[in-house]
């Protein structure tokens, strides 16, 4: 469960390592984001020669949360931390690699590229 001011790790090779959620997209009263939701983020720490710089604003999709996601069969998938993948204005991933597992909940038409790049789909 991600809200404004939540910090997330970055699960791609854009050069960013940590981002700060500045807005949950999807309505003015929307407070929380879960796996598969798009958020607006600010880069808080980045590698010196990466594609992104500290202070840049991007869209991102949440790929892992410590809160987890409930499946229809009753199982709960949780992770050790919160992670996101940076997106451009067309909601396409900026990076060319994804690190760590992602969940099956991302298998929509919008995020099939992320699922195909991920090393493991849980």
Curated annotation (Swiss-Prot):
Cited InterPro entries: Ribosomal_uL14 (IPR000218), Ribosomal_uL14_bac-type (IPR005745), Ribosomal_uL14_CS (IPR019972), Ribosomal_uL14_sf (IPR036853)
GO MF: large ribosomal subunit rRNA binding; structural constituent of ribosome
Q: Matching SMART domains, A to Z?
A: Ribosomal_L14
Q: Which GO terms describe its biological process?
A: translation
> Could you give one GO CC term from the UniProt record?
cytosolic large ribosomal subunit
> What keywords are assigned to this protein?
Ribonucleoprotein, Ribosomal protein, RNA-binding, rRNA-binding
Which CDD domains does UniProt cross-reference here? Answer: Ribosomal_uL14 (cd00337)
Q: Which Pfam families match?
A: Ribosomal_L14
The entry describes its oligomerization and partners as: Part of the 50S ribosomal subunit. Forms a cluster with proteins L3 and L19. In the 70S ribosome, L14 and L19 interact and together make contacts with the 16S rRNA in bridges B5 and B8.
Q: Which HAMAP family match?
A: Ribosomal_uL14
Q: Which family does it belong to?
A: Belongs to the universal ribosomal protein uL14 family.
UniProt protein name: Large ribosomal subunit protein uL14
């Amino acid at each position: 469960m991600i809200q404004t001011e939540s910090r997330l790790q970055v699960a791609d090779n854009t050069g960013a390592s940590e981002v700060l959620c500045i807005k949950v997209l999807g309505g003015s009263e929307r407070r929380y984001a879960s796996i598969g939701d798009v958020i607006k983020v600010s880069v808080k720490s980045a590698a010196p020669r990466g594609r992104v710089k500290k202070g840049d604003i991007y869209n991102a999709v949440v790929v892992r949360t410590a809160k987890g996601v409930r499946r229809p069969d009753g199982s709960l998938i949780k992770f050790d931390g919160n992670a996101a993948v940076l997106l451009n204005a067309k909601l396409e991933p900026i990076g060319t690699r994804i690190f760590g597992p992602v969940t099956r909940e991302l298998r929509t038409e919008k995020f099939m590229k992320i699922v195909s790049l991920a090393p493991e789909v849980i």
